[in-house]
């Protein structure tokens, strides 16, 4: 179980899966929301994670602890999702924000990944994410997330 009993940082995407949709899914899997946000990844520099969100992630990791925290992304594109995943694991690859050079090593998944979907209430996932899943490059996102996680 990835989510059961964990605190989740939900980072949604205006053009992908928004934060509130991720929240509903992860709550159905027995997780608690540490914080949630909906970003516009194409609005930020080169798809990098917003600097304010980086600080919130850093603060949450310090107060909750990396072992009790899971980041769930909702990015519309594989590349921006990968950048966000890298940011919360090995540090900000753009060296622009509070996580530049900071290896938090957080567990990170995209909401469309099978490992997470298996834990969600199926009806809630379908209601919250089903339509967007049809237009996202799910295979590309899964490949990128697996690449980042190694």
Swiss-Prot record:
Coiled coil: none annotated. Keywords: Oxidoreductase, Selenocysteine. The active site is at residue 43. Its EC number is 1.21.4.2, 1.21.4.3, 1.21.4.4. It catalyses: acetyl phosphate + [thioredoxin]-disulfide + NH4(+) + H2O = [thioredoxin]-dithiol + glycine + phosphate + H(+); acetyl phosphate + methylamine + [thioredoxin]-disulfide + H2O = sarcosine + [thioredoxin]-dithiol + phosphate + H(+); acetyl phosphate + trimethylamine + [thioredoxin]-disulfide + H2O = glycine betaine + [thioredoxin]-dithiol + phosphate + H(+). One of its GO terms (cellular component) is glycine reductase complex. Belongs to the GrdA family. This is Glycine/sarcosine/betaine reductase complex component A.
């Amino acid at each position: 179980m990835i989510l059961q009993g964990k605190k989740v940082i939900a980072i949604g995407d205006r053009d992908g899966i928004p934060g509130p949709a991720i929240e509903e899914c992860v709550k159905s899997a027995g997780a608690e929301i540490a914080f949630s946000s909906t970003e516009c990844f194409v609005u930020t520099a080169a798809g990098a994670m917003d600097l304010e969100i980086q600080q919130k992630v850093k603060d949450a990791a310090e107060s909750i602890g990396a072992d009790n925290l899971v980041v769930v992304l909702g990015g519309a594109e594989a590349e921006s999702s990968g950048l966000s995943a890298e940011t919360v694991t090995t540090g900000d690859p753009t060296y622009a924000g509070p996580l530049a050079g900071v290896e938090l090593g957080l567990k990170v998944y995209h909401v469309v990944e099978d490992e997470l979907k298996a834990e969600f209430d199926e009806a809630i996932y379908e209601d919250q994410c089903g339509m967007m899943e049809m237009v996202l490059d799910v295979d590309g996102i899964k490949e990128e997330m697996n690449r980042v996680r190694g």
